[in-house]
């Protein structure tokens, strides 16, 4: 659905980092390739997302809001 505002485990605000993360991932994908694990790690380091629980929240999020909207 929509990215949670805070990490479920530690309570850190992650919603503001999600948009910047997506932008950087989409820049890599616009080059016609998928991001490597090292590139994803560097993106998180640049954003200041250090804890693995916060990284998990961002990486595992699936944005389904556009698929659900037609049914409301």
Swiss-Prot record:
GO biological process terms, semicolon-separated: DNA-templated transcription
Free-text remark on how the cofactor is bound: Binds 1 zinc ion.
Gene3D superfamilies: Homeodomain-like
EC number from the UniProt entry: 2.7.7.6
Top-level taxonomic group: Archaea
Binding positions (Zn(2+)): 7, 10, 53-54
Keywords: Cytoplasm, DNA-directed RNA polymerase, Metal-binding, Nucleotidyltransferase, Transcription, Transferase, Zinc
Any single GO CC term annotated in Swiss-Prot or TrEMBL for this entry: DNA-directed RNA polymerase complex
Major site of localization recorded for this protein: cytoplasm
Enzyme class: transferase
Keyword Transferase: yes
Catalytic activity: RNA(n) + a ribonucleoside 5'-triphosphate = RNA(n+1) + diphosphate
Cofactor: Zn(2+)
GO molecular function: DNA binding; DNA-directed RNA polymerase activity; zinc ion binding
Localization terms from the record: Cytoplasm
Similarity comment: Belongs to the archaeal Rpo10/eukaryotic RPB10 RNA polymerase subunit family.
Subunit note: Part of the RNA polymerase complex.
Record's function text: DNA-dependent RNA polymerase (RNAP) catalyzes the transcription of DNA into RNA using the four ribonucleoside triphosphates as substrates.
Protein's UniProt name: DNA-directed RNA polymerase subunit Rpo10
Species per Swiss-Prot/TrEMBL record: Thermoplasma volcanium (strain ATCC 51530 / DSM 4299 / JCM 9571 / NBRC 15438 / GSS1)
């Amino acid at each position: 659905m929509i990215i949670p505002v805070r990490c479920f485990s530690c309570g850190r605000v992650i919603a503001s980092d999600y948009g910047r993360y997506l932008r950087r991932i989409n820049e890599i994908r616009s080059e016609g390739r998928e991001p490597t694990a090292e590139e994803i790690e560097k993106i998180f380091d640049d954003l200041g997302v250090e804890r693995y629980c916060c990284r998990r929240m961002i990486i595992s999020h699936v944005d389904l809001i556009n698929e659900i909207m037609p049914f409301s």
